[in-house]
Amino acid sequence: MSILDSIQRQIPPIHKEGYPFIGGFALASLILFWLWSPLGWIGTILTVWCALFFRDPVRVTPVREGLVVSPADGRVSMITMALPPAELGLGDRPLPRISVFMSVFNCHVNRSPIAGRVDRIAYRPGLFINAELDKASEDNERNSLVITTPTARIGVVQIAGLIAKRIVCFVREGQAIGAGERFGLIRFGSRLDVYLPVGTKALVSEGQTAIAGETILADLAGDDPSRAYRAN
């Protein structure tokens, strides 16, 4: 393996959603260099940041029935009981909710927390307040999915934030989806909420760093005495 091949293997691929933005920043940088070189260097830094923002690294998802993995890179900002959005159709009583906040420095490709079928997709327009605030779940623009497994229904909500102005969803209703499979992206800072069945215990803590498709948030079969797996 050549040195060039080794370097290429260390650089994560870029998601196609980022191509127009990276190209725009790169073009602006060239123009700024022509006008005044210090501005050009600022543009170059922003171009590199944009490429990092849209990075789409390979993830190794734990494969075991019942495991719920993080749908996003970021920080576990809240673990609470909350009413799910009405459009999810998950009932009118509070459910365990785990929220993962993504800063502008995190990878923003969203991944399915569990294997199943996408039974519902519902978009709701709204505000763009700070996604770290609890009321963002109700007030902000969001896109909600229900993923159904043989034993449970999981709600996943993409929530726009203060900077995020565009939610992208790649999947459609009725589609089968694997755990850790890419299903969407939110541009420039946002949050993902995961609604779990009543009685599900979180295997993460508030403030913990989460990796999309890898960090285990919960185990739906965690009360099974034959379950040998334990998350760290």
Swiss-Prot record:
Swiss-Prot/TrEMBL catalytic activity: a 1,2-diacyl-sn-glycero-3-phospho-L-serine + H(+) = a 1,2-diacyl-sn-glycero-3-phosphoethanolamine + CO2
Post-translational modifications: Is synthesized initially as an inactive proenzyme. Formation of the active enzyme involves a self-maturation process in which the active site pyruvoyl group is generated from an internal serine residue via an autocatalytic post-translational modification. Two non-identical subunits are generated from the proenzyme in this reaction, and the pyruvate is formed at the N-terminus of the alpha chain, which is derived from the carboxyl end of the proenzyme.
Subcellular location: Cell membrane
GO CC annotation: plasma membrane
Major place of residence: membrane
Stored InterPro entries: PS_Dcarbxylase, PSD-A
E.C. numbers: 4.1.1.65
Active site (catalytic residues): 190
Tagged with keyword Cell membrane: yes
Modification type Pyruvic acid (Ser): residues: 190
The protein's annotated pathway: Phospholipid metabolism; phosphatidylethanolamine biosynthesis; phosphatidylethanolamine from CDP-diacylglycerol: step 2/2
Membrane topology designation: Peripheral membrane protein
Requisite cofactors: pyruvate
Pfam families: PS_Dcarbxylase (PF02666)
Keywords, ordered alphabetically: Cell membrane, Decarboxylase, Lipid biosynthesis, Lipid metabolism, Lyase, Membrane, Phospholipid biosynthesis, Phospholipid metabolism, Pyruvate, Zymogen
Annotated site (Cleavage (non-hydrolytic)): 189-190
One annotated GO molecular function: phosphatidylserine decarboxylase activity
Disulphide bridges: none
GO biological process: phosphatidylethanolamine biosynthetic process
Known partners and oligomeric status: Heterodimer of a large membrane-associated beta subunit and a small pyruvoyl-containing alpha subunit.
Family: Belongs to the phosphatidylserine decarboxylase family. PSD-A subfamily.
PANTHER family, A to Z: ARCHAETIDYLSERINE DECARBOXYLASE PROENZYME-RELATED (PTHR35809:SF1)
Full protein name: Phosphatidylserine decarboxylase proenzyme
Organism, as annotated: Bradyrhizobium diazoefficiens (strain JCM 10833 / BCRC 13528 / IAM 13628 / NBRC 14792 / USDA 110)
